[in-house]
């Protein structure tokens, strides 16, 4: 008797969860982000200017996208295998990141998507050498990469 009682109770609970009122969740929040037209290089570098054009993209709100200030497209393969050419990165604007974090950088007028190594920018693809900073280099961080959009 006890097993049959438990089975019936579980069956009733399962039916209740599938009722239409169980699916009356709030609509998912849509966020609008700037997608900058110039790609951050995952390779040898491309120019990035503060007056770069952008388009707007809509993304579903979630804990990651809600922290993003803008998006930017990857160009190149130096961050393979984790990041591919054409991936759209979600970026939280900041001018400082910790060693080991991924970021968008400008070094001497060229933009990069790399891992920050303190005195260098590091590619994830071992076929690419580190970019070591010299005394006269002009380095700026535009933001921390916090995720990417699924294709």
Tell me the role of every PLM-derived stretch.
Residues 72, 114, 139:
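Residues that recognize and position ribonucleotide moieties
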Residues 20-22, 89-91, 102-105:
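Short, hydrophobic/aromatic-rich beta-strand segments within well-structured domains
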Residues 74, 91-92:
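Thr-Gly-centered strand-to-loop micro-motif
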Residues 118-151:
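Glycine- and charge-enriched low-complexity intrinsically disordered segments
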């Amino acid at each position: 008797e006890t097993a049959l009682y438990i089975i019936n109770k579980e069956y009733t609970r399962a039916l209740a969860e599938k009722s239409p009122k169980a699916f009356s969740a709030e609509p998912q929040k849509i966020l609008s982000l700037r997608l900058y037209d110039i790609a951050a290089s995952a390779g040898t570098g491309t120019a990035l200017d503060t007056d770069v054009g952008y388009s707007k993209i809509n993304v579903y709100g979630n804990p990651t996208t809600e922290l993003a200030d803008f998006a930017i497209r990857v160009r190149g393969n130096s961050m393979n295998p984790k990041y591919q050419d054409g991936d759209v990165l979600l970026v939280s604007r900041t001018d400082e990141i910790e060693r080991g974090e991924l970021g968008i950088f400008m070094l001497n007028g060229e933009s990069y998507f790399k891992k920050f190594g303190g005195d260098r920018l590091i590619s994830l693809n071992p076929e690419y050498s580190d970019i070591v900073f010299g005394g006269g280099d002009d380095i700026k961080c535009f933001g921390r990469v916090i995720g990417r959009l699924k294709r």
